[in-house]
């Protein structure tokens, strides 16, 4: 089931908070524990609570600390992005979101309010956040005073832009619409049939409900910081319009309209009394209240006259600012749904219930899980998965700066228990020079280890048939890579990561010698986890086997499918070639055909197809033409290349052209996990590879 939804507007004053209110009520009907999260709020000050968070928490009585319901203010978010810390922003938002996700069954997320001057910035920000949280999206469009065709075009453009960014738009709500019933049907049909999203779109049109967009006298009071002179019990009165009363009574009364707020200097007793009189007269419309400006109050005898009334019929407020400044400030006020305004809340909920099919929408959301995942989400999930059952990972290149910085991160984040190999004095000195805290990290100097002689004997026993003497075995165990691999072999470590300094051959040779391959597997191979903007694909073999045979290719495919499952990728395996189906001939194609046959024979439950060209494997439109009816073509997640030349070049091309994050190579087929780093690896690469190795170790132990 889906466990989240991101509601984003397309512009300001779309009535998004009313839709959020309705969605929360809908979710609480079917889901036991629902959290509310606004990644970005408008308030820069912590003294003032965000309006929508306050509304949802108070009305629904959600037991969530306010500090847990948001990550940044819009101002702070903008500063981080301007300082080149966009990744930090997304990482920290994801961490706060995950805290709620772990504790609740569903997280309802609300985007920014588009109250600033840079709508494009907010649109991009909301899209990035929704993508990195893995949320399906509800788009709320402002339909106020817009023609049907304009609404269709603008909403369609928004949906297409979000879809291009890899977002799963599940529903669009045209709110505050001022269209006819026929136009409403046109909007729904047009958007439903034109949408480019991968899943069907639910479209709803909610009519304008003027009372929700109008401020109350209480809103006016809060906005201006006004003092209430009279009518404390009538502050929920709606304000339809403003009128500045600076003329004589005879002229003023001609301008009185239903629901208007009369603004006048506080010493205009004539306007004050005539306003009160008009409210009591059936011949005049009902005004909403009086706002007295300039810090002036009515004369004492006027006060006495008003106080003599039994129940003052309207609220009377007083502000210190003069009339012109007051009206300027009021022009920026728009109506909000306050937690204590039951009338507005019930109006909003009733509107939502009348015009949105709650059963249909609830079913779409609760029974739906977005398959899209961003690189940051995948990396975050790697770390979290590794942390659940901490493994012991040995790093033979213990004095290398990148290794030490990665070890520091891994220990602080409790991703794995780290063992560093190397000269104890050298490693300790490097740690001190870098100012790192390595409490909890085990440093082992191979030749001084109490296990050294045991490891020498074990290696000699394993390799004596190859002519290795005891003295040669002792020399080998002085090599940290051999020593670390033996730690894994003997169960003193759960996995090893090396290669920041050493070559690939040096890293994996010891594993070939004595860890060896799993039963039924004759070949060690590798895959890259390719994190595209909206999904993770598995590419293999791109690093180890130059020209595998058909049988080896079949083994690589089966191993890659197991690796995919370990990392949460549902395997649909494409055996790649330069032709699709039976269209091509030649030795290379025949090898892939034979490999496909062998793989299907050995793993009949596996969704596997071949030969396929890359475009037919990844693009559904091409697949419909070249291989209609296939369960793999167009939706493959595991791509098996016929040789190293093709695989290595393709993964690098996709990495550069698509901006993909390539994690790997991840070795597969060994009895215990050993993984190789690129000599150009970054600290982040090392952290990810250790997490991957830890997860592989968990899988070997049956923990996942």
From Swiss-Prot:
Involved in acetate metabolism. InterPro entries: DRTGG, P-Actrans_bac, P-loop_NTPase, P_AcTrfase, P_AcTrfase_dom1, P_AcTrfase_dom2, Phos_Acetyltrans/Butyryltrans, PTA_PTB. This is Phosphate acetyltransferase. Pathway: Metabolic intermediate biosynthesis; acetyl-CoA biosynthesis; acetyl-CoA from acetate: step 2/2. Disulfide bonds: none annotated. Residues 380-704 are annotated as: Phosphate acetyltransferase. Its main location: cytoplasm. Keywords: Acyltransferase, Cytoplasm, Transferase. PANTHER family: PHOSPHATE ACETYLTRANSFERASE. Transmembrane segments: none annotated. Homohexamer. One of its GO terms (cellular component) is cytoplasm. In the N-terminal section; belongs to the CobB/CobQ family. It comes from Nitratidesulfovibrio vulgaris (strain ATCC 29579 / DSM 644 / CCUG 34227 / NCIMB 8303 / VKM B-1760 / Hildenborough) (Desulfovibrio vulgaris). It catalyses: acetyl-CoA + phosphate = acetyl phosphate + CoA. Its EC number is 2.3.1.8. One of its GO terms (biological process) is acetyl-CoA biosynthetic process. The lineage of its organism: Bacteria, Pseudomonadati, Thermodesulfobacteriota, Desulfovibrionia, Desulfovibrionales. It is found in: Cytoplasm. The N-terminal region seems to be important for proper quaternary structure. The C-terminal region contains the substrate-binding site. One of its GO terms (molecular function) is phosphate acetyltransferase activity.
């Amino acid at each position: 089931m889906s466990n989240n939804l991101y509601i984003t507007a397309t512009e300001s004053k779309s009535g998004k908070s009313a839709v959020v209110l309705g969605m929360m009520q809908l979710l609480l009907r079917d889901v036991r524990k629902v959290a509310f999260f606004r990644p970005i709020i408008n308030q820069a000050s912590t003294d003032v609570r965000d309006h929508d968070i306050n509304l949802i928490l108070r009305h629904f009585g959600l037991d969530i600390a306010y500090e847990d319901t948001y990550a940044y203010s819009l101002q702070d978010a903008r500063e981080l992005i301007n300082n080149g810390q966009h990744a930090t922003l997304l990482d920290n938002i994801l961490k706060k979101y995950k805290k709620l996700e772990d504790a609740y069954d569903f997280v309802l997320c609300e985007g920014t309010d588009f109250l600033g001057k840079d709508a494009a910035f907010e649109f991009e920000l909301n899209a990035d956040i929704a993508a990195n949280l893995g949320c399906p999206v509800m788009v709320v469009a402002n339909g106020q005073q817009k023609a049907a065709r304009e609404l269709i075009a603008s909403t369609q453009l928004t949906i297409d832009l979000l879809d291009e960014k890899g977002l799963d738009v599940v529903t669009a709500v045209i709110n505050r619409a001022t269209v006819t019933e026929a136009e409403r049907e046109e909007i729904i049909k047009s958007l439903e049939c034109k949408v480019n999203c991968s899943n069907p779109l639910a479209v709803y049109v909610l009519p304008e409900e003027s009372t929700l967009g109008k401020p109350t006298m209480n809103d006016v009071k809060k906005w201006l910081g006004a003092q209430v002179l009279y009518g404390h019990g009538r502050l929920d009165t709606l304000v339809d319009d403003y009128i500045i009363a600076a003329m004589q009574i005879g002229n003023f009364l001609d301008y009185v309209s239903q629901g208007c707020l009369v603004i006048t200097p506080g010493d205009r007793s004539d306007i004050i009394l005539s306003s009160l009189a008009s409210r009591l007269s059936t011949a005049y419309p009902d005004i909403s209240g009086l706002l007295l400006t300039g810090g002036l109050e009515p004369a004492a005898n006027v006060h006495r006259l008003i106080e003599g009334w039994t129940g003052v019929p309207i609220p009377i407020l007083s502000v210190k600012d003069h009339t012109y400044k007051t009206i300027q400030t009021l022009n920026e006020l728009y109506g909000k749904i306050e937690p204590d305004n039951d009338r507005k809340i019930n109006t909003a909920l009733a509107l939502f219930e009348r015009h949105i099919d709650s059963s249909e929408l609830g079913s779409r959301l609760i029974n739906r899980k977005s398959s899209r995942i961003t690189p940051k989400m995948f990396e975050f999930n790697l770390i979290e998965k590794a942390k659940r059952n901490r493994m012991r990972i040995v790093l033979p290149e213990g004095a290398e700066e990148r290794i030490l910085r990665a070890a520091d991160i891994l220990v602080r984040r409790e991703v794995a228990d780290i063992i560093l190999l190397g000269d104890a004095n050298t490693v300790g000195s490097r740690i001190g020079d870098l100012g790192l805290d390595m409490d909890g990290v085990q440093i082992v100097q191979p030749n001084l280890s109490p296990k050294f002689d045991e490891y020498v004997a074990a290696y000699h026993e394993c390799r004596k048939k190859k002519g290795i003497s005891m003295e040669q075995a002792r020399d080998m165990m002085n090599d940290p890579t051999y020593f670390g691999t033996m730690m894994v072999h003997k169960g003193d470590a759960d996995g090893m990561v090396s290669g920041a300094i050493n070559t690939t051959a040096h890293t994996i040779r010891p594993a070939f010698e004595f860890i060896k391959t799993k039963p039924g597997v004759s070949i060690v191979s590798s895959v890259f986890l390719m994190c595209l903007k909206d999904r993770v694909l598995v590419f293999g073999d791109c690093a180890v086997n130059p020209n595998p045979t058909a049988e080896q290719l079949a083994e690589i495919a089966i191993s890659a499918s197991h690796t995919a499952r370990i990392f949460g990728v549902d395997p649909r395996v494409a055996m790649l070639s330069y032709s699709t189906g039976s269209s091509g001939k030649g030795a290379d194609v025949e090898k892939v055909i034979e490999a496909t046959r062998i793989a299907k024979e050995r793993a009949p439950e596996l969704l596997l197809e071949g030969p396929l060209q890359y475009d037919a494997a990844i693009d559904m439109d091409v697949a419909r033409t070249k291989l209609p009816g296939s369960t793999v073509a167009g939706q493959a997640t595991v791509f098996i290349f016929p040789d190293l030349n093709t695989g290595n070049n393709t993964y690098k091309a996709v990495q550069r052209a698509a901006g993909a994050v390539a994690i790997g190579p991840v070795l597969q087929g060994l009895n215990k996990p050993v993984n190789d780093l690129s000599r150009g690896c970054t600290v982040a690469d090392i952290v990810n590879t250790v997490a991957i190795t830890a997860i592989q170790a968990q899988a070997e132990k049956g923990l996942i």
